[in-house]
């Protein structure tokens, strides 16, 4: 199963190419996957982003390590995570997979957004260090979340890319320069 998924992920690899970041500043990345009743959503897109991130940092290919760790972790998934919506969190670094954890997940309800300038934010790689994102989030002033603006362009919220539906054109629009190239954004 994984061999086919890894091959499919190569199709999406260009969607997640990033300029190389100084590898000394980034030592740990994370990938968060949604599972519905145990089935992974958009798995090839997540794999492509992980592979592109490793390439950008000059890290080893994690495909084999991920396959091995996932096989073990999925058998140890808590019973309450086998049904409904579950978040799988994969933490990895230059040497490979560090951990895979699971938790039940309910999307956060967002009814209000505050625009926050984020010209200083560089989050092209999904790092476990979200300090700069949380600094923006802390400026929400009573709103549920923030909508970050970089160079006068809408980018992302603190937890997701944005997608805007154009009723007349009957299609989704996403920012051309998001802070992080999201998997659902690439899927759209």
Task: Set out the residue ranges of the language-model regions.
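Conserved alpha/beta cores of soluble small-molecule-handling proteins
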Residues: 1-153, 179-187
């Amino acid at each position: 199963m994984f061999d086919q998924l890894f091959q499919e992920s190569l199709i999406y690899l260009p969607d997640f190419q990033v300029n190389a970041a100084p590898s000394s500043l980034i030592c740990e990345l994370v990938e968060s996957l949604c599972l519905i009743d145990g089935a992974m959503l958009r798995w090839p897109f997540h794999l492509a982003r992980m592979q592109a991130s490793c390439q950008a940092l000059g890290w080893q290919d994690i495909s084999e390590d991920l396959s091995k760790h996932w096989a073990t972790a999925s058998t140890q998934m808590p019973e309450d995570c086998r049904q409904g919506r579950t978040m799988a969190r994969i933490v990895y670094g230059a040497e490979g997979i560090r951990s895979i954890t699971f938790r039940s997940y309910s999307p956060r309800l967002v009814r209000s957004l505050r625009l926050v300038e984020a010209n200083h934010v560089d989050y092209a790689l999904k790092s476990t260090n979200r300090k700069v994102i949380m600094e923006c989030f802390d400026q929400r002033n009573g709103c549920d979340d923030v909508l970050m603006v970089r160079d006068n362009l809408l980018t992302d919220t603190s937890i997701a890319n944005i997608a805007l539906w154009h009723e007349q054109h009957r299609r989704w629009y996403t920012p051309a320069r998001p802070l992080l190239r999201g998997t659902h954004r690439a899927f759209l």
